[in-house]
């Protein structure tokens, strides 16, 4: 049925082009030979001009001033961005390729993990296995997103109202908003966590679990039912109050996509920060970054605490902070995102 419909559409388009060509030719001819035209000439001219515009300008994937998905703006971006990659794990796309599964298992060197397929099957008996309808992009839209990091450069930035003006506000790990609203805003739609970085969330916030091991998926099951898991490599919350329908799972294959395509294999695996940035490229039309990088004095610390050792992660080799920062810098230079550097 679909091929027949496609052929009919193609045939109709061909006839339309032929009609415009013949009519334009006739009118040009009649202008020199006949004093009156059988058809309103202005109407055909306008139709012809509109058709030319349609053929000249490529389809824009959104109605924003900047559209992330727009192709042929940057070869660097086009080589990395893969629209077909699905950021969230669902019951329908839960199968992992063998190489992806083996790579993912090595991230935190989990010993004797339980069967992943069985774990995922049990997981989606507890939480919904479909994609968050809020994340599904409309055919034509302008979805503006703020990705808010944890950098101390947010202190006294007064970005709060600007951040809250976005359609989606994505935060990560232990970042609080209470008491810091003037600088970081009060709105949160989605919050990225893993078990060891979990913090209590407001009822309306969707939790996006970033799983780095099978135990992380098992923790979601446990934390919403029996509470049997209270320790991974550090203590973790045994129970969480997040509504089950508000729990989403970051796809392990998407983590590998970020590592392979965007980080080119730098570091051992991507940080939550860069994972949230690339995630946003796939669900948003415009992306603004806040709270990424060091402050103006070169200090790496969180906006909610005075922690001199906050930048120690840069020396562990787990994440390549410099390479990740370079990726966001290039994205900003080609107008795919904007970076607000604070103070």
Curated annotation (Swiss-Prot):
Binding site for substrate: 108, 150, 173, 233, 269, 273, 293, 302, 319
GO cellular component: extracellular region; Golgi medial cisterna membrane; Golgi trans cisterna membrane; membrane; trans-Golgi network membrane
Disulphide-bridged cysteine pairs: 62-67, 64-142, 145-284
Topological domains, Lumenal: 28-343
CDD domains: GT29_ST3GAL1
EC nos: 2.4.3.4, 2.4.3.2
Major subcellular location class: Golgi
GO BP: ganglioside biosynthetic process via lactosylceramide; N-acetylneuraminate metabolic process; protein glycosylation; protein N-linked glycosylation; sialylation
Residue positions with a glycan: 28, 82, 117, 326
Similarity section: Belongs to the glycosyltransferase 29 family.
Free-text function comment from the UniProt entry: A beta-galactoside alpha2->3 sialyltransferase involved in terminal sialylation of glycoproteins and glycolipids. Catalyzes the transfer of sialic acid (N-acetyl-neuraminic acid; Neu5Ac) from the nucleotide sugar donor CMP-Neu5Ac onto acceptor Galbeta-(1->3)-GalNAc-terminated glycoconjugates through an alpha2-3 linkage. Adds sialic acid to the core 1 O-glycan, Galbeta-(1->3)-GalNAc-O-Ser/Thr, which is a major structure of mucin-type O-glycans.
Record-given protein name: CMP-N-acetylneuraminate-beta-galactosamide-alpha-2,3-sialyltransferase 1
